[in-house]
UniProtKB/Swiss-Prot annotation:
Swiss-Prot/TrEMBL GO biological process terms: 'de novo' pyrimidine nucleobase biosynthetic process; 'de novo' UMP biosynthetic process
Role this protein plays: Catalyzes the decarboxylation of orotidine 5'-monophosphate (OMP) to uridine 5'-monophosphate (UMP).
Name of the protein this chain belongs to: Orotidine 5'-phosphate decarboxylase
Gene: pyrF
Family: Belongs to the OMP decarboxylase family. Type 1 subfamily.
Active site (UniProt): K73
InterPro entries in UniProt: Aldolase_TIM (IPR013785), OMPdecase (IPR014732), OMPdecase_AS (IPR018089), OMPdecase_bac (IPR047596), OMPdeCOase_dom (IPR001754), RibuloseP-bd_barrel (IPR011060)
PROSITE patterns registered for this protein in UniProt: OMPDECASE
EC supergroup of this enzyme: lyase
Subunit structure: Homodimer.
Protein species of origin: Escherichia coli (strain 55989 / EAEC)
Length: 245
């Protein structure tokens, strides 16, 4: 176990904003990152960027002071998922996720893999229903539950397995906080400031609505990364959230 970057070496942020980095070019990504302040947000690195640029890219972001949500959505046999989660913890990321549909044994193995890391372990979050999915998509998979009901079933399994929370849509947040309690973390993509295009997300909310619904961490992508002044956009979002708190 070799932690690459301890939490004490990074900037502390109280912002619930996690900016999704979706770049094809490493230099473009770092150019954007150098325009923003790690006190204003955390960063999400997904499958495309991690596949292109690897762990070293994560380290470069950490060296700039950012906490990293490694969004790789591990979904495999329990032993493989556990080793993958431990590797993410070795990298020193702030948060990592798995697919809840991988089942109880997989999620339990992933949680147990983080025990040796103690207080340095990342938050372990499970994905319920992707925000791009609608009821018709679930029907195609042979499921008769609505996206909301299926997400709640997976969230209940996640909590039973001892994980820290789930990725869910903002529409589910109010219900989930009531059912699973305030300590169960909710991470929500599809968050877009007023006036932003919906893009490929189907179930979206503004940051203020998400905060009111009980979302703990809100993932925002293109409204920040494609802004002409991303630093100011982040400050405006955070200011609006402080006013709404």
């Amino acid at each position: 176990m070799t932690l690459t970057a301890s939490s004490s070496s990074r900037a502390v942020t109280n912002s619930p904003v996690v900016v999704a980095l979706d770049y094809h070019n490493r230099d473009d990504a770092l150019s954007f990152v150098d325009k923003i302040d790690p006190r204003d947000c955390r960063l999400k690195v997904g499958k495309e960027m991690f596949t292109l640029f690897g762990p070293q890219f994560v380290r470069e972001l950490q060296q700039r002071g950012f906490d990293i949500f490694l969004d790789l959505k591990f979904h495999d046999i329990p032993n493989t998922a556990a080793h993958a989660v431990a590797a993410a913890a070795d990298l020193g990321v702030w948060m990592v996720n798995v697919h809840a549909s991988g089942g109880a044994r997989m999620m339990t193995a992933a949680r147990e893999a983080l025990v040796p890391f103690g207080k340095d372990a990342p938050l372990l979050i499970a994905v319920t229903v992707l925000t791009s999915m609608e009821a018709s998509d679930l029907v195609d998979l042979g499921m008769t539950l609505s996206p909301a009901d299926y997400a709640e079933r997976l969230a209940a399994l996640t909590q039973k397995c001892g994980l820290d929370g789930v990725v869910c849509s903002a529409q589910e947040a109010v219900r989930f906080k009531q059912v699973f309690g305030q300590e169960f973390k909710l991470v929500t993509p599809g968050i877009r400031p007023q006036g932003s295009e919906a893009g490929d997300q189907r179930r979206i909310m503004t940051p203020e609505q998400a905060l009111s619904a009980g979302v703990d961490y809100m993932v925002i992508g293109r409204p920040v990364t494609q802004s002409v002044d991303p630093a100011q956009t982040l400050k405006a979002i955070n200011a609006s959230l402080q006013r709404s708190a």
